[in-house]
Every structure is written in C-alpha cells, then in structure tokens.
Amino acid sequence: MSYQQQQCKQPCQPPPVCPAPKCPEPCPPPKCPEPCPPSKCPQSCPPQQCQQKCPPVTPSPPCQPKCPPKSK
C-alpha cells in the first residue's frame, strides 16, 4: 500500500494551526552586568623620562676681560 492510500483511510482533518514561536518575553540585547571600564595598565604608567636628567641650564658667566689686571 502506498503512503498516499494509507493517509486517505484516515478521516481528513485540517492540520492544527501552529502559533508562531515567540520568546516568553521580548529578549533584551545582551549587556555587561556593569558598564565595562576601558582597559588600563594594572599600574598607572608614569610618563617616560630621560634616564639621566639634564642639569638645569646655568646662565653663562658674565664676560671677564681676558687679560688679568696688571699688578705692579
């Protein structure tokens, strides 16, 4: 017996109307439990400095006459 003949022996019934599947509630977009802070270094990184600090610039000494004063 073919599949169609077996089906015809049963009384014809309209197929049950399947409701469209829905979420029980509208699904919220996924979020972090808390607002995520921007990633940071574990320690705050100090600004990079020269390994040796330059000594403070001293003003050039005032000009002196090259010749020492003549002593008699």
Swiss-Prot record:
Keyword field: Cytoplasm, Keratinization, Repeat
Keyword Repeat carried by entry: yes
Sequence repeat intervals: 21-29, 30-38, 39-47
Region (Disordered) residue spans: 53-72
GO cellular component terms listed in the entry, alphabetical order: cornified envelope; cytosol
Compartment annotation: Cytoplasm
Stated induction or repression of this protein's expression: During squamous differentiation of epidermal keratinocytes.
Pfam families: SPRR2
GO biological process: epidermis development; keratinization; keratinocyte differentiation
Region (3 X 9 AA tandem repeats of [PS]-K-C-P-[EQ]-[PS]-C-P-P): 21-47
Compositional bias ranges of the Pro residues kind: 56-72
Record-stated family: Belongs to the cornifin (SPRR) family.
Role of this protein: Cross-linked envelope protein of keratinocytes. It is a keratinocyte protein that first appears in the cell cytosol, but ultimately becomes cross-linked to membrane proteins by transglutaminase. All that results in the formation of an insoluble envelope beneath the plasma membrane.
Annotated protein name in UniProt: Small proline-rich protein 2F
